Each structure stands twice: as C-alpha cells, then as structure tokens.
UniProtKB/Swiss-Prot annotation:
Purpose: This protein binds to 23S rRNA in the presence of protein L20.
Highest taxon of source: Bacteria
Organism: Haemophilus influenzae (strain ATCC 51907 / DSM 11121 / KW20 / Rd)
Molecular function terms, GO-annotated: rRNA binding; structural constituent of ribosome
GO cellular component: cytoplasm; ribonucleoprotein complex; ribosome
Stated name of the protein: Large ribosomal subunit protein bL21
PANTHER family, alphabetized: 50S RIBOSOMAL PROTEIN L21 (PTHR21349), LARGE RIBOSOMAL SUBUNIT PROTEIN BL21M (PTHR21349:SF0)
PROSITE patterns: RIBOSOMAL_L21 (PS01169)
Keyword terms of this UniProt record: Ribonucleoprotein, Ribosomal protein, RNA-binding, rRNA-binding
Subunit text: Part of the 50S ribosomal subunit. Contacts protein L20.
Protein's GO biological process: translation
InterPro entries assigned: bL21-like, bL21-like_sf, Ribosomal_bL21, Ribosomal_bL21_CS
Pfam families listed in its UniProt record: Ribosomal_L21p
Family in the record: Belongs to the bacterial ribosomal protein bL21 family.
Amino acid sequence: MYAVFQSGGKQHRVSEGQVVRLEKLELATGATVEFDSXLMVVNGEDVKIGAPVVAGAKVVAEVVAQGRGEKVKIVKFRRRKHSRKQQGHRQWFTEVKITGIQA
C-alpha cells in the first residue's frame, strides 16, 4: 500500500515505515502529524485518485528529526570586471517516519 500526498508545495510518494524529508514543519521531535491532502491511495489493485484529494484519506507520520540540508553555493561572476560574489544556502527540513496510511 502506498499513497501520494502534498506537503510544502511538493508531492511525495510514500509507503508505511518509510522515512521522508519534507520542507520544515514547526513541530517537536516525536510529535505526530496527519496529512489530509492525500492525492492518491493505492492498495493492491484498489486505486483511488482524488479530484483534487481523496475524501477521508490521510497519511499519519511521526517527526524523527529537524535539520538542515547540504550547502548550495551561489556564485555571481562578472567577467573582465575583477568582481565576484559568493553566497551559500542551507535549507531547513523535517524528517518524518510514515506510521500509517488510511483510505
């Protein structure tokens, strides 16, 4: 059984027991979160596709960790001008473990 749900402007395909990195959620470690925006739920041959969401479907998860991703370097280089600008960015994320899918 797997489901596709939406969180942080992105869609995630998950199954039970899987650990997923999402955009940062303001929750404490160990907290339980429910995602009601389930776009699709598949249970064997039974496929439910929402328009836009599946009614009554939700994905339940537990917050495992909060953290920051790998550094992305931004470089602006102006040729022949002896000018260069460098900047870095690390995006915050929330790591959750999927504990249940209900349809």
